């Protein structure tokens, strides 16, 4: 595939481009291949599941470890997506002045649709599902009184969440910071990264913000693997261990 990107996956690696995505094991054996036509593919991987969507397009492919795939037609432009370890997919979809956060079952059926607006909740910039797909975290960016603030909200799609408006069970605000990344690391541990701070959350039902660290330097990039997060600054790298 021309213009390909490689990602570590299972006992090998994924290769994806505008034309398709494939899984090759470390021995060089082609395990599966999914063709498509996308202008700007974005990929989410969790355990053996892979979700690939067309940024600003309307299609998502939800692919299991054996290569079985389900095509999801979102009907709206995809801005971001996340897959859980059981194949549940969450996607941020733009619809004019409204932005939707839809959750789809592995069958491709829409299970949840959350309506957001810039005035009420802010603009969702990042979404992530817990491994079991029961919790979802969303990082919002909102303008208020001439400055920007970020909001990290958690949704519970299980019984507990039914007692809350829009299933939102907890939410945390951070002034004068932009949080472009919010990620789950398992079923009950999650983290978010802003331009000048790092937050850690824990909870099986109602996640709590248990740790907040302000950074002296602005974060240039973030990489995560397993229980570790690496922060890339201007010329230096710092590692943080996540409690499982």
Regions picked out by a protein language model, each given a short descriptive name:
Residues 240-244:
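Conserved small/polar residues in nucleotide/adenosyl-binding loops
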Residues 1-48, 53-56:
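N-terminal "mature head" segments of proteins
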Residues 2-5, 38-45, 76-84, 121-128, ...:
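Repeated scaffold domains used in trafficking and secretory/extracellular systems
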Residues 5-16, 48-54, 87-94, 134-140, ...:
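Short beta-strand elements that form the blades of beta-propeller/WD-repeat-like
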Residues 26-27, 64-66, 105-107, 158, ...:
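Short loop/turn segments that connect beta-strands within beta-propeller blades
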Residues 100-174:
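Solenoidal tandem-repeat scaffolds enriched in leucines and small polar residues
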Residues 57, 95-98, 142-146, 236-238:
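Short glycine/acidic-enriched loop and turn motifs that connect beta-strands
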Residues 29-34, 67-73, 110-117, 165-172, ...:
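A short beta-strand motif characteristic of beta-propeller blades
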């Amino acid at each position: 595939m021309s213009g390909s990107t490689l990602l570590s996956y299972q006992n090998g690696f994924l290769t994806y481009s505008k034309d398709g995505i494939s899984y090759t094991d470390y021995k060089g054996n082609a395990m599966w291949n999914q063709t498509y036509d996308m202008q700007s593919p974005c990929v989410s991987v969790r355990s053996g599941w892979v979700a690939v969507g067309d940024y600003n397009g309307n299609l998502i492919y939800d692919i299991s470890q054996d290569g079985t795939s389900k095509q999801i037609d979102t009907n709206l432009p995809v801005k971001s997506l996340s897959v859980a370890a059981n194949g549940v997919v969450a996607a941020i979809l733009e619809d004019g002045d409204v932005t939707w956060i839809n959750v789809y079952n592995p069958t491709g059926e829409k299970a949840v649709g959350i309506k957001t607006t810039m005035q009420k909740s802010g603009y969702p910039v990042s979404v992530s599902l817990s491994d079991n797909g029961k919790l979802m975290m969303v990082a919002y960016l909102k303008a208020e009184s001439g400055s920007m603030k970020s909001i990290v909200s958690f949704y519970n799609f299980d019984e507990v969440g039914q007692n809350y408006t829009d299933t939102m069970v907890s939410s945390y605000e951070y002034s004068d910071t932009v949080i472009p990344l919010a990620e789950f690391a398992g079923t009950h541990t999650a983290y978010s990264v802003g331009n000048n701070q790092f937050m850690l959350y824990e909870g099986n039902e109602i996640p709590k913000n248990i740790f907040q660290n302000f950074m002296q330097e602005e974060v240039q990039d973030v990489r995560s693997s397993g229980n570790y997060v690496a922060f890339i600054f201007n010329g230096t790298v710092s590692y943080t261990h996540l409690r499982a």
